[in-house]
Design a protein with these regions (language model features):
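The beta1-alpha1 cofactor-binding region of Rossmann-like NAD(H)/NADP(H)-dependent oxidoreductases
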Residues: 39-40, 56-66, 101
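Conserved mid-core segment of classical short-chain dehydrogenase/reductases
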Residues: 76, 87-105, 124, 128-136, ...
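Residue(s) in the substrate-gating loop at a strand-loop-helix junction
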Residues: 145
Length: 188
């Protein structure tokens, strides 16, 4: 895919890997929607890159819909890069007792459920795209981690969330390939 002129959403784009991804896409000529919960940083980056900002908690359906609508208003949505995520270090049983279930669920909800939320909403928009001359309608990229295969002590929640990303990518890719939308995961 020629990135120049294409519209991409990058989640978690106000900092870290997401910010680096947004900067790389913009440097290649993409129009980038910075989708993040960090409004001040996200708005500043969007201004700097000539893109747009969408206040987006990836776990919230309405926020995801708004980010996709923002992207579609800029042109044909051709890419989603899921970088939003959190990591906590907490042993299954530590000196203060059992791993907090709420913390485990929070990591799964943001890293895995949030990624799926954005994939399904972006894919819906991409399915409506007229194919590019190459036949493509878009690309869906989710950030996994080596922790999906080799998580360390204290990384149960993070490793499970990234294992989920790896596990859901192939079935999504198989289905999306029928309409020429690519789905991939990779180590961040």
């Amino acid at each position: 895919m020629d990135i120049a002129g294409q519209v991409f959403i990058v989640t978690g784009a106000a900092s870290g890997l997401g910010e680096g991804t947004a900067r790389m896409l913009a440097s290649e000529g993409a129009r980038v929607v910075i989708a993040d919960v960090q409004a001040d940083k996200g708005q500043a980056l969007a201004r700097e890159l000539g893109g747009a900002f969408a206040q987006c908690d990836v776990t919230q359906e309405a926020d995801g819909q708004a980010a996709v609508a923002q992207a579609v208003s800029m042109g044909k949505l051709m890419g989603l890069v899921n970088c939003a995520g959190i990591a906590i270090g907490m042993k299954t049983v530590g000196k203060d007792g059992a791993h907090a279930l709420a913390q485990f669920a929070k990591v799964i909800n943001i890293n895995l459920v949030g990624s799926f939320n954005m994939i399904r909403l972006a894919a819906e928009a991409m399915c409506k795209n007229e194919p590019e001359p190459t036949g493509e309608r878009g690309v869906l990229i989710s950030t996994a981690s080596v922790a999906a295969y080799d998580g360390q002590i204290g990384q149960a929640a993070y490793a499970a969330s990234k294992g989920g990303i790896v596990g859901m990518t192939l079935p999504i890719a198989r289905k999306r390939s029928m309409d020429r939308t690519l789905a991939r995961s990779g180590d961040g």
